[in-house]
Amino acid sequence: MAFKKKFTPKKKFCRFCANKNLPVDYKRPDILKDFITDRGKIIARRITGTCAKCQRRLTLEIKRARQMALLYYTATHSAEHLKKM
């Protein structure tokens, strides 16, 4: 009988702590989009691997970018959905 190896996930690290030149800023929606699902939800830190401090800052900056219309609040609608309206 063969024993299965336990799955050990790859160690996650905070991208912002590892690279100090990568700022968390609402003016950079290209970076912030990596931390948002296709539905527009902010991805949890246990999935992204960011530290608690950077996750709080990231959440705040995403909310600022949404208020300034640099990011969507929800997912973009497809053309088929808009035709039905």
Swiss-Prot record:
GO molecular function: small ribosomal subunit rRNA binding; structural constituent of ribosome
Signal peptide region: none
Sorted UniProt keywords: Ribonucleoprotein, Ribosomal protein, RNA-binding, rRNA-binding
CC terms in the record's Gene Ontology section: cytosolic small ribosomal subunit
GO biological process, one term: translation
Classification via InterPro entries: Ribosomal_bS18 (IPR001648), Ribosomal_bS18_CS (IPR018275), Ribosomal_bS18_sf (IPR036870)
Listed HAMAP family: Ribosomal_bS18
Oligomeric and partner information: Part of the 30S ribosomal subunit. Forms a tight heterodimer with protein bS6.
Role: Binds as a heterodimer with protein bS6 to the central domain of the 16S rRNA, where it helps stabilize the platform of the 30S subunit.
Similarity section: Belongs to the bacterial ribosomal protein bS18 family.
Name this polypeptide is given: Small ribosomal subunit protein bS18
Organism from which the protein derives: Solidesulfovibrio magneticus (strain ATCC 700980 / DSM 13731 / RS-1)
